[in-house]
Amino acid sequence: MNKASNNKIVRIGMVNFINTAPIYETWKTRSHPENWHVVEAPPSTLNQMLADGELDLGFVSSYEYGVRPEKYRILPDLSISANGPVGSVFLFSRIDPKLLDNHTILLSGQSETSIALVKIILEKFYRVQPSYIVGNVNGEKANEASGILAIGDEALRLSASGEFQYQLDLGEVWCNYTDLPFVFAICAVREEFCMENAEIVDAIHEEFLFCKGEGRQALESICLQVAPRIPMHPDECYVYLRAIKYGLGDRKQLALEKYYNYLIERGEGSALSVPLQFF
């Protein structure tokens, strides 16, 4: 690995869900320059930190690039995505999701990507108009809502509980309606950091790609390591992580641009988000 480095601290964001384990658990076994500092947090926190200049690069919600594309470049061939069911981004509902018009949906505040996605699915695909509140999906508001959007590890726990009659996998619904995969997160780097530290960005990008490949090869042992965090059986963890994809090929780029066009149509996204701009 290229050990490109200088004395400047490089702040790298990493989503603290087990869906990053094939990359991150491998990363943690490797030696890196001492000035490479990893910050673990939910996607929404990483989004804000990257936007505020508190991170230099890292995995963030796809939504973050869609609304502030002029601030970033995308690192090629890295994502958190799915070609169908993702298994950890669900709309849990007490009634048929197509009947949620005028009902209240409680949204997890952990990922702007999934908040926008569930609104696209309900309002554009299903033609219903619920009301939305943001809050703790395990708090008191959960008992008052007809539906709950949950992501990541908390979605895995809710799914296993069997509490809700309807569990809508948003990756699967998107795929059914668009015939495309869905990209939940990308690896983005701040534009000015790219310009000033291209060699460091190259080295970190190279390391992420290496970890991605190694992690897929070591998936069974990684599942034994991370499954207790949920908790879930290692075999279930293996099935779940096998469905998560980490590349960003042509179809995923098309899917990302389609999502961004929906955001633009909704008045949320920037017209500069399409076409994608890579490092």
What does each of the following model-derived ranges do?
Residues 30-39, 125-135, 269-274:
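A local structural motif
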Residues 11, 36-37, 73, 129-131, ...:
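Conserved beta-strand segments of alpha/beta enzyme cores
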Residues 2-29, 87-145, 153, 254-257:
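Bilobed "Venus flytrap"/periplasmic-binding protein-like clamshell domains
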Residues 15-102, 109-114:
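Short, glycine-/small- and polar/acidic-enriched structural segments
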Residues 134-222:
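Pocket-lining segment of extracytoplasmic ligand-binding domains
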Residues 195-262:
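Secondary-structure end/capping motifs
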